[in-house]
UniProtKB/Swiss-Prot annotation:
Similarity annotation: Belongs to the ABC transporter superfamily.
All residue ranges annotated as the ABC transporter domain in the record: 2-238, 282-531
Its membrane topology: Multi-pass membrane protein
Localization per Swiss-Prot or TrEMBL: Cell membrane
Designated name of the protein: Putative ABC transporter ATP-binding protein BL0043
SUPFAM superfamilies recorded: P-loop containing nucleoside triphosphate hydrolases
Top-level taxon of origin: Bacteria
Keywords, alphabetical: ATP-binding, Cell membrane, Membrane, Nucleotide-binding, Repeat, Translocase, Transmembrane, Transmembrane helix, Transport
Species of origin: Bifidobacterium longum (strain NCC 2705)
Keyword ATP-binding: yes
UniProt xrefs under PANTHER family: ENERGY-COUPLING FACTOR TRANSPORTER ATP-BINDING PROTEIN ECFA1 (PTHR43553:SF24), HEAVY METAL TRANSPORTER (PTHR43553)
Pfam families according to UniProt: ABC_tran, CbiQ
């Protein structure tokens, strides 16, 4: 129950919530709707106990958590019965094995190991992911990640589940799956509070709470989404200062052959990818893409054309390769096979070598030509903004095209006015709302005056008013002859704006068939690294053993010792069931650096017998020996470290490290928290790396010199990404802190561990082998 709640983000200058009173009944399904900025997400966090208000009274699950001030103990008790799922599932994942991630919350609650196993099985079955329990959730599709996040909450058996736009970035089938899960929870009596932009998601709600400008303006009963009230809800949000996205229509089998767009013209029935062959501006032929470590191709033998001036919608389920495809069209990702031609530029070509060979990528001159003709709006706008002001960011592309400052200013003004955001010109892009950031990112691409505009879900999470602006923009661009390829999950949107639709084929599932999970022990796959002896070692023994072996490498000073070190390293790789070439590929930048250091040593060492004289420089036999020894022993250290990281999950490392440094607790040092920070750092390094790559790609897509410029220009371009990377790090940290609170992690709590740490015979054998190896190195 909330009574007269007030909440401010700026110490009372403005109020995100102002005088809100609301009672949520046990077992009720409540939907929060309203324009962006109306306070829905803030109210959801207050209901979840993740944020305290600035005034009023809050009672959660019978606990009076806020009156004159926050009651920490009451908040702690209430949060044990409340789960929350956020819009971005990736920031809620704490480890790289699904079952370990689901176990994290129950471990924080201190549940017994056997009960944790049962909770994992039940929650994964409830969301349809029981057959992926050993998979890496960070590599799943968006829909699967969101279901994994829900499973993590269900494993805590919450009395109330709060969801903040959980389907905002999902396709129709994934959205339907999430709604099915909520229907099942509703039938079990779980209290559900659901923030949504989709009127059709409110159908099964008991009540709908309508919000505007931080206030509740009405509470209504749910009705069918095709009723006049649902239309009125959508219309009221459209007319607000910031509205919400309209619900997608669902054409039935008896839909007419043609559908009417907003402007009265008609859209052909959703079609295949064959366009007008007489004047194509985009030509894709037998395109295939496979991720480096994947067995199946995510895109397999795809061919289509797009005619000049055509507007085409690209549709498909989450994980079907839509974003990968448009990245290949923009020369930001290289295909595995096939050819691509965009605006007359051979982005990827096989020539006469045949279509099954890896295609030749565009050279620098061709890339520069491509950037002048093609604009790319990314899915996440925060990745595409990096300047100090919106105007400077929009000017980035035109300046890279070599335009004069007068023409650059004209381009900036025209682009901002076209999207009705001229008043934001002097604002920092990092201070804008998500919708404003998306419009600013689009303006930056439009300022480049592209002939081809590629947009990755430009209207996702936008309110109805901003969405309408995008549709008007697309019609304006079409009238100017601009070719548009737009990724969308919204069939109604495709019918309104597109000439036709290219459907992405559904990729083969990672694993198929029904699975009835009854196992309550940590799982291992039947083959590969996860089933290897090295993987199954107790992480404490493995951590100490690998560190000992790695430090021993620094004692290698003779060829015999080096040969023994190489033999041991190869044996470890074999025992880990890893491909040696894959291991070397993963660390090849470091290996290149070591080779360069070895070359330097060749000319620095003066002792020994000269074997080669190069003018004033000479290479001696001792110089060669030292160069090889130093480079190889450092390489062996790096390789062993790579094997350890590959075969040990962040959760296992956390548990092992926390146990090994637990004696520090007696000195008042929080060993468990130190271990968790280490684990989360390892978990989010790939995420931040991907975000850095996205910012670099955003610069490249607008002709940035980070891709094709001189060394000085590249260094200058690299410096421009520091601020957005720092902002992204803070954003991830803030989201992660909320996720940890939602999963009841607290400093100093007694956590149980689902993966029991026990010393087995294989651990003793491994420890003995390490000791023998160290003794042999010393003896030699």
């Amino acid at each position: 129950m909330l009574k007269d709640i007030r909440f401010s983000y700026d110490r009372g200058t403005s109020w995100a919530l102002d005088g809100v009173s609301l009672t949520v009944h046990a077992g009720e399904r409540l939907c929060l709707v309203g324009p962006n900025g109306s306070g829905k997400s803030t109210l959801a966090r207050l209901i979840a106990g993740l944020t305290a208000p600035d005034g009023g009274e809050v009672t959660l699950l019978g606990q009076r958590v806020y009156a004159a001030g926050p009651n920490a103990d009451a908040y702690r008790a209430a949060r044990h019965g409340i789960g929350m799922v956020f819009q971005n599932p990736e920031d809620q994942l704490v480890t790289t094995v699904l079952e370990d991630d689901v176990a994290f919350g129950p471990e924080n609650l201190g549940l017994e190991r056997e009960l944790i196993g049962e909770r994992i099985v039940d929650s994964l079955q409830a969301v349809g992911l029981a057959n992926l329990r050993q998979s890496d959730p960070t590599r799943m599709s968006g829909g699967q990640q969101q279901r994994a996040s829900i499973a993590g909450m269900l494993a805590m058996n919450p009395a109330m589940l709060v969801l903040d736009e959980p389907t905002a970035m999902l396709d129709e089938s994934a959205r339907a799956e999430v709604m099915r899960i909520l229907d099942d929870l509703q039938a079990r009596g779980t209290t559900i509070v659901h923030v949504t932009h989709h009127p059709d998601e409110t159908v099964h709600a008991d009540r709908i709470v309508h919000m505007e400008a931080g206030r509740i303006i009405g509470i209504t009963a749910a009705v069918d989404n095709r009723s006049p009230l649902a239309e009125a809800v959508s219309q009221s949000e459209t007319e607000g200062s910031i509205g919400t996205e309209a619900a997608p229509s669902r054409p039935t089998n008896d839909s007419p052959r043609q559908r009417e767009r907003e402007d009265g013209s008609e859209l052909p029935l959703l079609s295949d990818g064959i366009g007008d062959m007489t004047n194509p501006i985009i030509r894709v032929s037998h395109l295939t893409y496979r991720y480096p470590s994947a067995k199946r191709a995510v895109i397999d033998d795809l061919s289509f054309t797009i005619a000049r001036g055509e507007t085409v919608a690209l549709m498909g389920v989450n994980g079907s390769g839509k974003s990968t495809l448009v990245r290949m069209l923009c020369a930001l990702t290289a295909p595995t096979a096939g050819s691509i031609e965009v605006a007359g530029v051979p982005v990827a070509s096989t020539g006469k070598r045949g279509r099954n060979v890896r295609p030749k990528s565009a050279n620098r001159k061709q890339l520069a030509q491509l950037r002048r003709h093609v604009g790319y709006v990314m899915q996440h706008p925060e990745h595409q903004l990096f300047a100090d002001t919106v105007a400077e960011d929009v000017a980035y592309g035109p300046r890279n095209q070599g335009l004069g400052e007068t023409e650059v200013a004209d381009r900036v003004r025209e682009s901002l006015e076209l999207l009705h955001i001229g008043h934001l010109a002097d604002r920092s892009p990092f201070d804008l709302s998500g919708g404003q950031q998306r419009l600013a990112a689009i303006a930056g691409v439009l300022a480049c005056n592209p002939d081809v505009l590629i947009m990755d879900e430009p209207t996702a999470s936008l309110d109805a008013q901003a969405k309408k602006r995008i549709h008007e923009l697309l019609r304006t661009l079409k009238s100017r002859g601009v070719t548009v390829l737009i990724i969308t999950h919204d069939r109604e949107e495709a019918e309104q704006i597109a000439d036709r639709v290219v459907r992405m084929p559904i990729a083969a599932p990672a694993s198929g068939g029904p699975v009835t999970a009854t196992v309550t022990e940590p799982a291992v796959s039947s083959n590969g690294p996860a089933h290897s002896v090295i993987h199954r070692l107790d992480p404490r023994v493995k951590m100490v053993g690998f560190l000992a072996a790695m430090f021993t490498m620094f004692a290698v000073n003779t060829p015999t010792q080096l040969a023994l070190g190489i033999a041991i390293t190869l044996a470890v790789i074999a025992a880990a069931r890893l491909n040696p070439l894959r291991v070397l590929e993963s660390i090849h930048p470091i290996l290149i650096l070591l080779v360069l250091m070895g070359v330097v040593n060749l000319f620095v060492v003066r002792t020994g017998t000269p074997v080669v004289a190069l003018g004033p420089l000479s290479i001696t036999d001792q110089g060669v020996t030292i160069a090889v020894l130093y480079a190889c022993r450092f390489a062996l250290v790096i390789i062993l470290g790579a094997v350890f990281l590959t075969t040990t999950t962040p959760t296992a490392m956390t548990d092992a490290f926390a146990t090994l440094i637990s004696p520090l607790n007696r000195l008042g040092i929080h060993a468990q928290e130190i271990a968790l920070v280490m684990s989360l750092a390892l978990r989010f390094i790939p995420t931040l790396t991907d975000e850095t790559r996205a910012i670099v790609d955003a610069q490249s897509a607008r002709g940035g010199s980070i891709e094709t410029g001189s060394l000085a220009q590249r260094i200058k371009a690299m410096s421009a990404i520091i601020v957005p990377i720092f902002a992204g790090t803070l954003r991830h940290a803030d989201n992660l802190s909320l996720a940890l609170d939602a999963r009841c992690y607290e400093e100093g709590i007694r956590r149980t561990h689902w993966r029991a740490l026990t010393i087995a015979a294989r651990d003793l054998i491994f420890a003995a082998a390490v000791i023998i190896y160290i003794a042999a190195i010393i003896a030699l």
